[in-house]
Amino acid sequence: MASANPETAKPTPATVDMANPEELKKVFDQFDSNGDGKISVLELGGVFKAMGTSYTETELNRVLEEVDTDRDGYINLDEFSTLCRSSSSAAEIRDAFDLYDQDKNGLISASELHQVLNRLGMSCSVEDCTRMIGPVDADGDGNVNFEEFQKMMTSSSLLNSNGSAAPPST
């Protein structure tokens, strides 16, 4: 009887059973490449790569900042558990961003937003899209970068009960 190759059967944070502490620890150890009991920002990049999502160093530092509740600059097992619970939604947000970022330059312009919304059957003008971008555009460049998009998508005040974007208030 052949045993499964452990290299091809590794669980990922998105598939780990949160109710099984042993499985969680096994996945944590897989990403804690130097075995120091904590995941660095560099090792965190490997976690997201395993889930099929690549983040810039700035984005990884932001994730670390949000998950690192004890503020030691690393992710421990408890913090990793929290990250695993939220990681599928993070991957979904990245996928949604990529859908809107038509030219793949890392920014969503009013024109790109207009194209996608019209394709989805929503009637709006480029000017409407420019107004939608305004409150989200923290750096004032007229576009939405991933960080701004992620902040918008995770802000409960901008989402309605079914998880879709609420129209901007006037």
UniProtKB/Swiss-Prot annotation:
InterPro entries: EF-hand-dom_pair, EF_Hand_1_Ca_BS, EF_hand_dom, EF_hand_pair_protein_CML-like
PROSITE patterns from the UniProt entry: EF_HAND_1, EF_HAND_2
Sites where the protein binds Ca(2+) 2: D68, D70, D72, Y74, E79
Binding residue positions for Ca(2+) 4: D137, D139, D141, N143, E148
Domain EF-hand: 19-54, 55-85, 88-123, 136-159
Binding residues for Ca(2+) 1: D32, N34, D36, K38, E43
Binding site for Ca(2+) 3: D101, D103, N105, E112
Keywords on record: Acetylation, Calcium, Metal-binding, Repeat
MF annotations from Gene Ontology: calcium ion binding
Modified residues (N-acetylalanine): A2
Gene3D superfamilies, sorted: EF-hand
Induction cue: By touch.
Domain of life: Eukaryota
Any one cellular-component term (Gene Ontology): nucleus
SMART domains (UniProt xref): EFh
Function: Potential calcium sensor.
Protein name per the record: Probable calcium-binding protein CML27
Species annotation: Arabidopsis thaliana
UniProt lineage: Eukaryota, Viridiplantae, Streptophyta, Embryophyta, Tracheophyta
Gene responsible for this protein: CML27
